[in-house]
Amino acid sequence: MSTKNEQLFLQAKKHIPGGVNSPVRAFAGVGGTPVFMHKAAGSKIYDTEDNEYIDYVGSWGPMILGHAHPKVIEAVKAAADDGLSFGTPTTFETSVADIICDIVPSVEMIRMTSSGTEATMSAIRLARGYTGRDKIVKFEGCYHGHSDSLLVKAGSGMLDIGEPTSQGVPADFAKHTITLPYNDPQAIKDCFEKWGDEIACVIVEPIAGNMNMIVPSQEFHDTLRAQCTQGGAVLIFDEVMTGFRVGLKGAQAHFGIEPDLICFGKIIGAGLPVGAFGGKREIMECIAPMGGVYQAGTLSGNPLAMRAGIAMFEDLTVEGFYEGVADKVTYLVEGIQAAAHKHGIKLRSTKLGGMFGLFFVKDEATGVPQNFDEVTACDMDKFNTFFHGMLDRGIYLAPSAYEVGFMSSKHTTEDLDATIKAADDVFAEMSAAS
């Protein structure tokens, strides 16, 4: 990448740890120097030298309307003119709450936060307060933010108490977290048989978007719902990535499962800093000031994010919106898959709604990965080569083999064809080099 980016990265490292404010941005997984972006519009982002890239990161999901959508920008400007934040209730947060509760059947009440991490952290505290239990269950490869309870991996045995995955997380704290393999119904049954009456909640990405993209089996979700109901545990769907991305009603509608609590991310504010958690009324009424579970935030429900979200939902609720985005994903993924086959590249893919995943497997017998171990067994070197080849051709993918891709309504057929052509060129080079 250009000397300009190297200079900017060096400058950033002077006062920002690692030069970034979120680790994946550092390109550690793919190597090289991160590209410093300057502006964005529609399906494109532009670096500091005004080079154009077709963007499939979309600020990690929320830009489903594309960047700088005129309606959203107009709403944000109007909100800013009226004052950035009040520290009081506003009608705008009520409007967003009404919209979400009207759309998502499992959400009877909802509380705004300022991030997805706050949403998952608060949902877990609420589940513990509601049940009077301490233990929580999560799954390998699922990411739910950086709160201490969730930076935990499985112990030496599948049903062992968890071990911290980050320095600074006390082992005594991590012992309350049980980590299971994703997409494994039997592991859920075994866990509840051993710990059932101690489990406060199970938190899960209903479709995993942090080990690339894994769409689990229906049996996995049916088992989760049945075991949580039987064991009196709260089922939490973390739809920070999938909410309003795979469909208007999220992944829960795809599987026909109603969780007890659900977490949303910045998509509900059209990309501004915001999150939310909601669910059954009897659980949500345990939150202060109604109940004894404390949760608060000075900027929760801030007017900029709320008014941006209201503007965004006007488009999301138009009939056919999600079908249009899904058609774009299908066109792109099928085109890339055909190009890979043409050049003998062993590529597997997944897709649903506005999300897609690409996996470079090591042999023809290997199918689409179904869990974290199978994702880690993929050919990361080939992904890294593919990533940089696409970047050099003006295609911006997530700089990690463990991240999902996102489509927007603003991606054109020309964008998709250019992306497929770039992939074809990169695959040709990869094939010639092997």
From Swiss-Prot:
InterPro entries on file: 4pyrrol_synth_GluAld_NH2Trfase (IPR004639), Aminotrans_3 (IPR005814), Aminotrans_3_PPA_site (IPR049704), PyrdxlP-dep_Trfase (IPR015424), PyrdxlP-dep_Trfase_major (IPR015421), PyrdxlP-dep_Trfase_small (IPR015422)
What is this enzyme's class at the first EC digit? isomerase
Give the signal peptide range: none
EC no. given is 5.4.3.8
Instruction: Give the pathway annotation.
Output: Porphyrin-containing compound metabolism; protoporphyrin-IX biosynthesis; 5-aminolevulinate from L-glutamyl-tRNA(Glu): step 2/2
Q: What keywords sit in the KW lines?
A: Cytoplasm, Isomerase, Porphyrin biosynthesis, Pyridoxal phosphate
Any idea which residues bear N6-(pyridoxal phosphate)lysine here? 266
Q: Which cofactor does it need?
A: pyridoxal 5'-phosphate
User: Where is the protein found, in the record's own terms?
Assistant: Cytoplasm
Could you state one GO cellular component term attached to this entry?
A: cytoplasm
- Catalytically driven reaction(s): (S)-4-amino-5-oxopentanoate = 5-aminolevulinate
Q: A single GO BP annotation from the record?
A: protoporphyrinogen IX biosynthetic process
Does the record's keyword annotation contain Zinc? no
Molecular function via GO: glutamate-1-semialdehyde 2,1-aminomutase activity; pyridoxal phosphate binding; transaminase activity
Instruction: Please name one Pfam family that this protein belongs to.
Output: Aminotran_3
User: Which PROSITE patterns does the UniProt entry name for this protein?
Assistant: AA_TRANSFER_CLASS_3
HAMAP family per UniProt: HemL_aminotrans_3
Quaternary state and partners of this protein? Homodimer.
Homology family: Belongs to the class-III pyridoxal-phosphate-dependent aminotransferase family. HemL subfamily.
Q: In its UniProt entry, what is this protein called?
A: Glutamate-1-semialdehyde 2,1-aminomutase
Q: Which organism is it from?
A: Psychrobacter sp. (strain PRwf-1)
